[in-house]
Regions:
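A residue-level marker of the well-folded mature domains of exported/periplasmic proteins
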Residues: 2-358
Length: 358
């Protein structure tokens, strides 16, 4: 018996943020994506957001959105994964998506962006501009996706300078200043968080040069969540969402977009030399076209073990599950016990094996 799915004329979208867009660069990017939805679809889309949702309150908030008749719910943080799973068990027909890399559950679709593509290009820029072989990288949470970004940056730097070494520091260690640690090593080209919260005056984000407290921004990744949200909402409006679910009934659905869909981009400072800018444009163009893949072997870890053989390209799943550091990275992955309280909660859910193992 045939079952017909009539696409809706309008879509009501609800967003959950664990922090305010004014206080969190992460939530700010998602808020820009929500507003892009409204700009793109006009009266065909209605959106609402709930900010500063605590992890323990997320299930109740999702339940309220379902009761209020929202068609799709975007839980825009990995900390909401458990709440999404529980609500999907109660409401199997609800459209609930979690922004994470590891939501391998049939009823919960996950979504994320391939920021590693931009990190590879930023690594190349850093190596081109650094006067020394050491380049700084400040990471936050040792969760899946973080080693991917670190290694992409390291490989991009190594492509330009074979002697390049990435000095890895963590911002979530109590009582530790990654900036001071890098300054002590005389490291001045640094990759840090991708964006500063709107209310903060700090310019220490993206790729920057720091000398005697003076920061010069060089380049930064753009997380264009609007492109991803637009694609998902359009699939609902056209009826493709239901078709995707039927065709993938036995496996989890994940959305993982990058430069090819303009979901990831790069902004460069006018300070970049013309030749360096040409390199950036070339890499961006080739990655966007699928003609250049950042993760092609040989790739060796810090212990000298070959993880990827020569001329072999990693699959998306292998990229997501990466839990080692490339051979030209100086530093280590901290354990969950070493992290501050905020980081412990997220890492306990999505931490890589090196961080969560006993």
């Amino acid at each position: 018996q045939s079952v017909w799915h009539k696409p809706p004329q309008t879509v009501r979208c609800a967003f959950l943020y664990n922090r305010s867009p004014q206080d969190s660069g992460w939530s700010y990017w998602h808020e820009l994506g929500r507003k892009a939805l409204e700009d793109t679809f006009g009266s065909r889309v209605e959106t609402v957001c709930c900010e500063c949702v605590a992890q323990e309150d997320a299930q109740e908030v999702i339940e309220r959105f379902i009761e209020d008749g929202y068609d799709v719910i975007f839980a825009a943080s990995p900390v909401f994964l458990d709440a999404c799973i529980r609500q999907c068990a109660i409401h199997p027909n609800a459209k609930i998506l979690n922004c994470s890399l590891l939501a391998s559950y049939h009823n919960v679709r996950s979504y994320y962006l391939r920021v590693y593509e931009a990190k590879f290009v930023l690594g190349a820029i850093a190596a081109a501009l650094s006067e020394s072989d050491e380049i700084g990288y400040i990471a936050d949470y040792p969760i899946y996706g973080t080693p991917t970004s670190i290694n992409a940056f390291a490989l991009g730097a190594q492509m330009v300078n074979p002697r390049a070494q990435i000095v890895l520091e963590w911002s979530t260690l109590p009582g530790h200043s990654p900036e001071a640690a890098l300054a002590a090593r005389d490291v001045h080209i640094i990759s840090s968080r991708d964006i500063s919260a709107p209310h903060l005056e700090s310019r220490a984000f993206g790729l920057y040069h720091e000398q005697d407290g003076v920061i010069a921004n060089l380049a930064m990744p753009i997380w264009n969540w609007g492109k991803l949200y637009e694609g998902i909402v359009r699939s609902i409006l056209t009826g493709a969402w239901s078709d995707e679910g039927e065709h993938n009934a036995d496996r989890a659905m994940n959305y993982y977009m990058g430069m090819s869909t303009d979901a990831i981009d790069i902004i460069c400072s006018q300070r970049l030399p013309a030749r360096t800018r040409r390199l950036v444009d070339l890499l961006h163009e080739r990655i966007r076209a699928g003609a250049f893949l950042p993760f092609v072997g040989p790739i060796v870890d810090q212990a000298g073990q070959v993880h990827v053989a020569a001329d072999v390209a990693l699959t998306p799943q292998e990229i997501i599950l990466m839990d080692y550091l490339a051979g030209n990275v100086i530093g280590r992955i901290p354990s969950v016990d070493e992290l501050n309280d905020v980081a412990k909660g997220l890492v306990s859910l999505q931490g890589i094996r090196a961080a969560t193992k006993e």
